[in-house]
Amino acid sequence: MNTKTQPRFLITGSSGLLGSAITSILDSQGISWTALHHGEEGWDPESGVFDPKHLEGITGVIHLAGEGIAAGRWTDNQKQKIHDSRVKGTRALAEGMAAADQKPAVLITASATGFYGNRGDEICTESSQPGQGFLTEVVKDWESAADPARDAGIRVVHLRLGIVLSEKGGALKKMLPPFKFGLGGRLGDGQMWMSWIHLQDAAQAFVTAATKDSFTGIYNLVAPHPVQNSDFTTALGNALKRPTVFPVPAVMIKLLLGEMGESLLLASTRVLPEKLEASEFEFTYPKIDEALKDLL
C-alpha cells in the first residue's frame, strides 16, 4: 500500500459478525473505512452490479458479502444464490477496481476451506489440490472472479475461512442451547476434523492482510490446531461445565439438512494455516480450549 496515502477501506458485509469485528479493529487503529451496504445504489452482488463511484478516495477493498451458506437447505435456488452472490459480486468489484482511474491498491476477499472438500485425516495446506462438491466449485469460481483486479496489478488476497467461533453468531451460537442444557454430543462418529478460528484472530488476520503489502494470494484462515468433532464436543462441554452424552446420528443430520448437513457438519477438513504462520502472524487463541474459555 502506498505509504504516502492514508488508508481508507471500502467494506462489504461490514455489519455481519466478521465485518463488525474487523471494523472495530480498524477503528481502534484509527484507520478510516466506508461501508458498502447491500441494496445501496450501485451495488447488487447477486446481479453483479457495482458502480465504481464507490471507489473515490478508497485505497483498498475488503469484500465479505455473500449469501449465508447455512441460511437454509441447499435447494437449487439457494445454491444459485450462494454461488452468484459471491462470484458475481467479486467479479463486479474486481472489474470496477481494474477500470478505475485511481486504482485501489488491494482487494481482500473472504473465501472458504470448503475448497478442500471432505478429506478425512489428510492435512491440507494452501498448496493442496481442490476437493469435490458444491462448495469446492463455489470457491474455485469465487477466487477466480478476482482475476480482473489481479491482472490490473492490484494486490489480491483470498482468506479461506474455517469455522469462525463466536458466541454472538455463526456455528457456535447455534450449538450453545442444547449444550447448555446438557443435551449436546458429538456429530456422527465424531471423527471428522474441524478447522476453526476465533473471531478475533480472523478479524485481525483480515486487517493484517489489508495493511501489509507482503500478503498476497491464498491464505488458510484457521487456527494452527484443528480438532476432531469428538474433541471439540468435549472442550465445549468442559467450557460450559455440562455433560456431552447425546450424540447426533449422521443419518439424522442427512435427513434433516440434506446436502448442506453433509458438507458443513459431517465433512472432515483438516486444514493448517501454513502461509499465515510463515508470515509470523500471531494467533491469540491457537488452541480450542482457550478459545472457548474466552468466548464462554
Predicted regions located by residue number:
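NAD(P)H-binding glycine-rich loop region in Rossmannoid oxidoreductase-like domains
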Residues: E41-A92
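Conserved Rossmann-fold NAD(P)-dependent oxidoreductase catalytic core, especially the SDR/UDP-sugar
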Residues: R91-G133
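C-terminal amphipathic/interface module of NAD(P)-dependent oxidoreductases
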Residues: T3, P7, S263-L296
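Mid/C-terminal beta-alpha module of Rossmann-like enzyme folds, strongest
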Residues: K212-E259, K293
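N-terminal Rossmann NAD(P)H-binding glycine-rich loop of SDR-like oxidoreductase domains
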Residues: R8-S28
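Glycine/proline-rich active-site loop of Rossmann-fold NAD(P)-dependent oxidoreductases
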Residues: K140, A152-I154, L165-K174, A209-Y219
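Conserved beta-loop-beta element that borders a ligand/cofactor-binding pocket
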Residues: S111, S144-E167
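Alpha-helical substrate-binding/gating segment
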Residues: L176-G184, M192-P226
